[in-house]
């Protein structure tokens, strides 16, 4: 047996996660996280990655929206048709820092370097730099044929996510370890405890 060779599509593992029986599992054992798992009913690793990133101050308020869209109770809001490709994997919810950067690139023509400057300005709450970036974002969107009000509204929606947003690679690393511990708990419960 090698933990590095397990399937990340094991329904029994997802059943355990969906049951909320996650005491002892990396990142997934708090009462709030157990409740979030039971409501989400994850069925692929991307759900665990998203939940690890969402279960933080700020983004946590978006867990119900993610779940409602995931389960078809609500239609995802992609903010603008140009952003559907970026936001579709997360049901219209901005979760990762990378999404904020991709939105700036797609909507406002930011280069990857400029998008990273925007992300850093949002994360560090530097008002002067943030105001400069907001003007750049809106001006770029205008050049892309997007109305000023729409661009300003989207900027206001992405701003808090960049502040609290989790880097997807970190969320993925945590989610893989969480899934591996869930696998061990599912198939080796005696050894697990």
Where is each model-derived feature located?
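Noncatalytic, beta-rich nucleic-acid-contacting surfaces in large DNA/RNA-processing enzymes
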Residues: 1-193
